[in-house]
Amino acid sequence: MGKDTIADLLTSIRNADMNKKGTVRVISTNITENIVKILLREGFIESVRKHQERNRYFLVSTLRHQKRKTRKGIYRTRTFLKRISRPGLRIYTNYQGIPKVLGGMGIAILSTSRGIMTDREARLNRIGGEVLCYIW
């Protein structure tokens, strides 16, 4: 039975965001590194660094906590992450069927033949793949 490192990454970020933690530490694999790079590029996390402990590499990410001010006061926005394709049920799509998350306000992360990319990049390259997760 294998481990789902993508689900572990998303769950760690979700739990740290709900508990208002500043940093998240996850095991570093090729796929988690690529997903964290996309999150960094899209502005969902502030910084990331690679850390080594006893022959194991970890990614230490600093989360971005956004606060919005309204007439009713200040409230904190949350980052929502949802795993779509999982080991028991893989979800594939062509470039025409790539979903828009919240009408284009969120992102979908896809694993394609050209690497891991966002839904916008996949549409521009006209390439489909496995829908890994939604982030909004």
From Swiss-Prot:
HAMAP family named in the record:
Ribosomal_uS8_B
What NCBIfam families does this protein's entry cite? PRK00136.1
* One of the GO biological process terms: translation
List keywords of the entry alphabetically: Chloroplast, Plastid, Ribonucleoprotein, Ribosomal protein, RNA-binding, rRNA-binding
What the protein does comes down to: One of the primary rRNA binding proteins, it binds directly to 16S rRNA central domain where it helps coordinate assembly of the platform of the 30S subunit.
An annotated GO cellular component of this protein is: chloroplast
This protein's encoding gene? rps8
The UniProt family comment states: Belongs to the universal ribosomal protein uS8 family.
- Protein's name according to its UniProt entry: Small ribosomal subunit protein uS8c
Q: Pfam families from the xrefs? A: Ribosomal_S8
Name the Gene3D superfamilies on file. 3.30.1370.30, 3.30.1490.10
UniProt GO MF annotations: rRNA binding; structural constituent of ribosome
Q: How does it assemble?
A: Part of the 30S ribosomal subunit.
Where does the UniProt annotation locate this protein?
Plastid, Chloroplast
